């Protein structure tokens, strides 16, 4: 979001979301979506060939880092070229851990292997994502999960889909029945962030039915959009891990704010994405953590 459109100091009276307004490029963005889907599916296939649930485990930090970089290099070779051809004037964000607002205009913000750490350890929660950001608003995204063949998509103003079927958040309205999730955004967070994570998890465990801690964020946000879990919160402003899922949740009809209830944007320091009927109560839980 541009500098003149920073988040509000107080929560608005209406349902807060960073995705309000008409998308003047809805038709154009919708026409672009199949190209983006093809790109993430192709990149996903290249990474699926490298996946094994049992073999080739890294034996230390250096091996972990090398495996992550090797996977990234394979995926980006399949992802970058078709997206740059489709939108040659759009910028490209290479740094998957980058934070904060982008310069004006259009940018591709991919996560060439979201959940790379899971992939190299033989676990199943990983995907390939690509999101088009226009003037700091996500307007189009595709998230492909190669192990299941599922593809989540969203266009601002056009709804969120899973393989062509429209997504909706859960219908739950009581915290005591809620299934919620959080997770670490990246290695090496500061001590204050770890303390907030721990305190918020304790607060949630005292309020909801079940709380899950897992990575990556995109998978859990997609589950919120699909009504499979009821909320996700994270003390993070890493762009590539949040943009795709935030758009999916918003277009599915969920609430996407920071943990104080202000509209979420790339200027936000944290995120809460939830089914609408639980959002206010979840804010109250997180208000105990500062």
Regions found by a protein language model. Give the residues of each.
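Short loop/edge segments at beta-strand edges and connector loops
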Residues: 94-96, 164, 215
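Short loop segments at secondary-structure junctions
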Residues: 133-137, 147, 156-159, 165, ...
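Residue-level signal for inorganic ion chemistry
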Residues: 47-50, 79, 83, 116, ...
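N-terminal subdomain of lithium-sensitive/metallo-dependent phosphomonoesterases centered on the IMPase/IPPase/PAP
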Residues: 1-113
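DPxDG-like acidic metal-binding loop motif
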Residues: 102-161
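A glycine-biased, small/acidic residue-tolerant capping/turn segment at secondary-structure junctions
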Residues: 54-58, 125, 257-265
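Short glycine/threonine-rich catalytic loop with a Thr-x-Gly-x-Asp
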Residues: 93, 119-122, 213
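An extended, acidic
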Residues: 168-290
